[in-house]
Amino acid sequence: MTGTTLAATYGPISGADLEAELAQPRIADGDAQDAAVYERDGGARALPFASGGAPPDGDRADVRRAAGAGDASVRLTRVSKRYGERAVLADVDLSIGRGSFVSIVGRSGCGKSTLLRLVAELETPSAGTLVKRGDGGGALDTRIMYQEARLLPWKTVLQNVMLGLGRRAKDDARAVLDEVGLLARANDWPAQLSGGQRQRVALARALVHRPQLLLLDEPLGALDALTRIEMHALIERLWREHRFTALLVTHDVQEAVALADRVLLIEAGRIAFDQRVPLDRPRARASAAFAALEDRVLQRVLTGSDAAPAAPNAAGPEGASRGRAAPASGLRWAV
């Protein structure tokens, strides 16, 4: 993992780790020991907090981001990944526009999370090239969130967000907790929070670094339906305000269509389907256009062929094939 990548997660923290940490004498900067644990277990180096700037102007900014504004943040060229004799990804070509929101769907084991880990530089390609360009052509500061928040249980909510930043970052941490609606819980312990609240803290911990690329590996998979919808709205609002590039891996087709400018399907280690989502934000999930687009993506996942003509205002990219589709009848999951 490079110095510009933050896995917004902790590796397994055993009881021995906890006992050893509690037995350590407190030092001038009490966070230093925990930052070392964080780095050891797949954490990251802290970067200075930078102002997110003014939010973009409404839907016009979303259109520019969906098109990538001609500026790729991430580009993969003929990327393959093998584990021994098993090929997981094969000759993947992908360009992700700066400031866009891309979702990846597919059946279990198709290579979705492997692709995300390659982009995060937690894995290296077996073949091909991966190029990440930050603002001005520099390094692309990246954060990644997983399904488990993995907060340090002996740290308060505020201290978890501040981890690795030092005590002077307290104001920044409080500001981002306010953004995710948890400032009032800043001094609570992680055990006092619900699952959705813990994921909000994990999101705050990633956003306090003001990343240019946020990778989301099924971060909402363990939450109930209503909490997921609330988190969708929160992630979308923060994405529009902070203008980072987002790449989401999910089994939930409705979630993919609700959040993304573009939905990719991975089959047999390749990108088999690339569907633009030209729907206005916030997405009206009860609309015919949304339902038809969700159905089209789901049918493509389930049947391996592009289903019926897309709904009005939900056309796919040029060259996408079209056919008939049966209603998805409430099916949302591509497992």
Swiss-Prot record:
Residues 308-335 are annotated as: Disordered. Its main location: membrane. Pfam families: ABC_tran (PF00005). It comes from the Bacteria. GO terms for cellular component: plasma membrane. PROSITE patterns: ABC_TRANSPORTER_1 (PS00211), ABC_TRANSPORTER_2 (PS50893), SSUB (PS51291). Residues 74-293 form the ABC transporter domain. Keywords: ATP-binding, Cell inner membrane, Cell membrane, Membrane, Nucleotide-binding, Translocase, Transport. Its EC number is 7.6.2.14. It is an enzyme of class 7 (translocase). It is a peripheral membrane protein. It catalyses: ATP + H2O + aliphatic sulfonate-[sulfonate-binding protein]Side 1 = ADP + phosphate + aliphatic sulfonateSide 2 + [sulfonate-binding protein]Side 1. ATP binds at residues 106-113. It is found in: Cell inner membrane. InterPro entries: AAA+_ATPase, ABC_transporter-like_ATP-bd, ABC_transporter-like_CS, ABC_transporter_ATP-bind, P-loop_NTPase. GO terms for molecular function: ATP binding; ATP hydrolysis activity. Belongs to the ABC transporter superfamily. Aliphatic sulfonates importer (TC 3.A.1.17.2) family. Part of the ABC transporter complex SsuABC involved in aliphatic sulfonates import. Responsible for energy coupling to the transport system. The complex is composed of two ATP-binding proteins (SsuB), two transmembrane proteins (SsuC) and a solute-binding protein (SsuA). This is Aliphatic sulfonates import ATP-binding protein SsuB.
